[in-house]
A protein has these predicted regions:
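Iron-sulfur cluster-binding electron-transfer modules in prokaryotic oxidoreductases
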Residues: 1-197
């Protein structure tokens, strides 16, 4: 576990850019002082924010190269596990589906990575119609635009066939909470299945 604070994503979503930048700089400084080799993020929204740190600075800014160094050391937890041999793990037999969040498939450009791990673990995943579409959480969007956000959520849950599964998994904390507010089917972070092994 590394020292740091909020990645700054929520502040940035709310256009509190200076507050976000203060947090970003503090994180960069702390992590470089600690001499970290890798940052593994289980929250895809935080992961994409940290990977995008260089975009917050002009190339002439002294923080630009520091932000690039941190960005290059940041991996989603799926990137860490995708090449691991998981064949010896005994997975719980549960009928599940997976929601691929925008932050993982579009932001981090890692479409299908979690699905490939779940398939390796022995789960049959259906094709989700319009899987590329947002569930409506979108950072602070669900709070600032609740009506449209709920419409997007309801469409996503319909496409996930939420009432046909025992469990819905995702990689994004905001998506998890947002989807859970619209269904009785438990919604969990996909990495939680490893607790049951």
């Amino acid at each position: 576990r590394i020292n740091g604070e909020c990645c700054g994503a929520l502040d940035q979503h709310l256009s509190a850019n200076e507050t976000a930048l203060t947090k970003v700089k503090r994180n960069i400084d702390n992590w470089l002082i600690e001499g970290i080799d890798t940052i593994i993020s289980a929250a895809s929204g935080c992961g994409v924010m940290v990977k995008d740190y260089p975009k917050l600075f002009d190339k002439n800014d002294p923080y630009y190269s520091k932000a690039e160094e941190i960005s290059n050391k940041t991996k989603d937890i799926a990137e860490f596990l995708v090449n691991e041999d998981l064949s010896q793990l005994s997975t719980p037999k549960v009928k599940l589906n997976y929601h691929a969040p925008c932050t993982l498939q579009h932001g981090q450009q890692l479409p299908g990575i979690v699905e490939s791990i779940l398939i390796k673990l022995g789960y049959d995943l259906p094709d989700v119609p319009d899987a590329h579409m947002c569930c409506g959480s979108a950072g602070t969007y669900s709070t600032l635009q609740p009506k449209i956000s709920k419409q997007l959520r309801n469409e996503k849950l319909k496409n996930l066939d939420d009432d046909q599964f025992e469990l819905i998994l995702t990689s994004n904390i905001g998506c998890l909470l947002h989807l859970q507010n619209g269904t009785k089917t438990p919604v969990k972070h996909w990495i939680e299945i490893f607790e049951w092994l």
